[in-house]
Amino acid sequence: MMKTNGMDIGLVSAILPDRTLEEVVGFAAGRGFDCVEIMCWPVGKAERRYAGVTHIDIDRLDEHATEGIRQMLQRHGMRISGLGYYPNPLDPDESKSELFIGHICNLIRAADRLGVPVVNTFVGRDPSRNVDDNLRVFAEKWPPIVKLAEAHNIRIGIENCPMYFTNDEWPGGKNLATTPAIWDRLFEIIPSPAFGLNYDPSHMVWQMMDPIQPVLDYAHRFHHVHLKDAHVDRERLKRVGIMATPLEYHSPRIPGRGDVDWKAFFEALDRVGYKGDACLEVEDKDFEGSSLDVERAIDMALVHIRSFVPTKS
């Protein structure tokens, strides 16, 4: 018997880009979510799908705005699980790297003001350089970010998405924190408990890795969890092989429509005593025809998730 009532289920706000913060929070509350991960990109044009969403503009987050957000959350009986911003902090263009890191640092300060415990992001990567070269740059750029997080009592959750899907990210992808072997090296460089993972099992599926074992091995580093599924088209994979760009053989799916064994996943979280937040992330193209399709995807996924993690009584 699972005892997952210690875990809260939330919604990643990126799938509702055209709604206001209060509309997102109200929608999530009405659907039966416990919390929300709020996207906090700088205001501007998105460079990729699901990016560039600004539900909180932290550049305008003064004391009055902060108090307004607190009161709004209280009205809806909701809270924010984490502030999300997913750029490439190790971008080879130094001006971009500095801009991205600067916003992450501002996000840490904003999380402190809002009383939000986690900032979720990517480590980043120069896709044209190998892992060792990128680790050297990581060792230069990331320790000051984590020191700032420690000073503000904020945890950083690094998502394990390789950010490699098409030729646009070829050959290495735009995020270094992709596998347990690399996580170990990142944690050797930055052993701080403030630096951990925003774990998404779907990314292990299409890398042909076990999505359950990391729960057992790295639970102490789990600061946040994303609930997303993925389906690997085995017939297509037979034709294109693992050297193809990943979207040639796999598709992101809502939980229950892909290859993740969600019963085993939640049992593993239960076994390790995870009591953090797990937020549904919707990136399923089969449900992008209209806002009603998006809502249907959210509802279907939540029904599946709640079969393992019931609503708290």
Regions found by a protein language model. Give the residues of each.
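Short histidine/acidic/glycine/proline-rich micro-motifs that form metal-
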Residues: I15-L16, H55-D57, Y86-D91, R125-S128, ...
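Histidine-acidic metal/acid-base catalytic patches
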Residues: M1-D34, P42, Q74, G115, ...
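Flexible loop residues that form catalytic
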Residues: W41, N88, G124, C161, ...
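Active-site acidic/histidine proton-transfer and metal-coordination neighborhood
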Residues: E23, E67-R79, P89-Y199, W206-Q207, ...
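Glycine-rich, proline-tolerant flexible connector loops at the mouths of alpha/beta enzymes
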Residues: M39-G68, R129
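Conserved beta-strand positions in the central sheet of alpha/beta enzyme cores
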Residues: E37, G82-G84, N120, G157, ...
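Short, basic/glycine-rich phosphate-binding loops at helix/coil junctions
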Residues: I80-G84, A244-P246
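Residues that cap or flank secondary-structure elements
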Residues: I15-L16, R60-L61, L99, R136-V137, ...
